[in-house]
From Swiss-Prot:
Organism of origin: Arabidopsis thaliana (Mouse-ear cress)
GO annotation terms (biological process): response to zinc ion
Name of the protein this chain belongs to: Probable elongation factor 1-gamma 2
Function per UniProt: Probably plays a role in anchoring the complex to other cellular components.
Boundaries of every GST C-terminal domain copy: 87-215
Alphabetical UniProt keywords: Elongation factor, Protein biosynthesis
SUPFAM superfamilies for this protein: eEF1-gamma domain, GST C-terminal domain-like, Thioredoxin-like
Domain EF-1-gamma C-terminal: 253-413
Taxonomic lineage from the root: Eukaryota, Viridiplantae, Streptophyta, Embryophyta, Tracheophyta
Span of domain GST N-terminal: 1-82
Record's GO cellular component terms: cytosol; nucleus; plant-type cell wall; plant-type vacuole; plasmodesma
């Protein structure tokens, strides 16, 4: 008999086991035609879990309920993986972070989320206490992640899977960018993990809510219908006042960068030159760049990742940079970038070069892309020939770069 997961699609608790199954090579079938409120109240389901909660995993040895227990079972099913650590102390630390995530993150986040969604009565003091406790948990997690890529050891464990599934619900519902920006290492960790193939296969494309849901309003009681009076002659209806009609949609506000004085440098021309130059790159593309470059209308910036000591695993480092470039998509019209991942083994160094419209890094990028805070930014002085040559080398992916091999070079254009 195959393992069968009984729950509705997208259940946070079930996702823990489904992601663990991807890492552990365990096959799990998801029950067809599951209807919450119907299937879980049936006699057959109640035999598996007497209180009717989901998820439930049906196994050849019998059913299992409680999501962390299910995830633990799946993570050990094949035995040949690192989800539970490589030593007794690592196993204990994994269990420690699972408990921490459940009690300090998930429990407090649900106390904030449930009333806002109408699943529980709303109380402002209770919400304030829940948010305060959640912040305390996130601060502790942020401190740990300042010097650790994963919660335990140097690879994904069950602790990471459980924690990310808990955080994912918060990011999707109540934890806005304004809220999470106080915890940059948690943000980096979350976006790095959800972009791993095993997580992405189960969670899809993770998104962050833009606003906290409003408090549900209670329906006011309907007033008693007054007794009908004899009908009077209806007054002549007035023509509707134009001012009371729907307002015409307001024109979309222009990006401040569109209001800058015109520049002789056309960014799309540079991007085409970069993409189409297949040989003699230094003589054609690099020379063309410096011929085009307008220091009045554009600025060049070096960036260096602040936490290179964390970059011990190549694929995690590459995904970290890839996630950064994805989140820079909102700036594509106004920027060009090169990101170099340097080194033949960890810790890998991440260095970048960016061309931005305007004399400074655009404010909307600093506000919207949390990764910006994870880098040291230095404006390029093109009167310094050494800095100018460094720009040229970064554009052409020169190797070795500053004495180190290139693990990869990524271009944003």
């Amino acid at each position: 008999m195959a393992l069968v997961m009984h729950t509705y699609k997208g259940n946070k608790g079930a996702n823990k086991a489904l992601i663990a199954a991807e890492y552990a090579g365990v096959k799990i079938e998801e029950s067809a035609d599951f209807q919450m409120g119907v299937t879980n109240k049936s006699p057959e389901f109640l035999k598996m879990n007497p209180i009717g909660k989901v998820p439930v995993l049906e196994t050849p040895e019998g059913p299992i309920f409680e999501s962390n227990a299910i995830a633990r079972y799946v993570s050990r099913k094949n035995g040949d993986n690192s989800l539970n650590g490589s030593s007794l102390i690592e196993y204990a630390h994994i269990e420690q972070w699972i408990d921490f995530s459940s009690l300090e993150i998930d429990a407090n986040m649900l106390k904030w989320f449930a009333p806002r969604m109408g699943y529980a009565p709303f109380s402002a003091p209770a919400e304030e206490a829940a948010i305060s406790a959640l912040k305390r948990g996130l601060e502790a997690l942020n401190t740990h992640l300042a010097s650790n890529t994963f919660l335990v050891g140097h690879s994904v464990t069950l602790a990471d899977i459980v924690t990310i599934c808990n955080l994912n619900l918060g990011f999707a519902t109540v934890m806005t960018k304004k809220f999470t920006s106080a915890f940059p290492h948690v943000e980096r960790y979350f976006w790095t993990m959800v972009n791993q193939p095993e997580f992405k296969k189960v969670l899809g494309d993770a998104k962050q809510t833009e606003a906290v849901p409003p408090v549900p309003t209670k329906k006011a009681p309907q007033p008693a219908k007054p007794k009908e009076e004899p009908k009077k002659a209806a007054p002549v209806a007035e023509a509707p006042k134009p001012a009371e009609e729907e307002e015409a949609p307001k024109p979309k506000a222009k990006n401040p960068l569109d209001l800058l004085p015109p520049s002789p440098m056309v960014l799309d021309d540079w991007k085409r030159l970069y993409s189409n130059t297949k040989s003699n790159f230094r003589e054609v593309a690099i020379k063309g760049f410096w011929d085009m470059y307008d220091p009045e209308g554009y600025s060049l910036w070096f960036c260096d990742y602040k936490y290179n000591d964390e970059n011990m695993v190549s694929f995690v480092t590459l995904n970290k940079v890839g996630g950064f470039l994805q989140r820079m998509d909102l700036a594509r019209k106004y920027s060009f970038g090169k990101m170099l991942i340097c080194g033949s083994e960890g810790p890998f160094k991440v260095k970048g070069l960016w061309l931005f419209r305007g004399p400074e890094i655009p404010k909307f990028i600093m506000d919207e892309v949390y990764d910006m805070e994870l880098y040291e930014w230095t404006k390029v002085d093109i009167s310094d020939e050494a800095q100018k040559e460094r720009v040229s080398q970064m554009i052409e992916d020169a190797e070795p770069f500053e004495g180190e091999a290139l693990l990869d070079a990524k271009c944003f254009k």
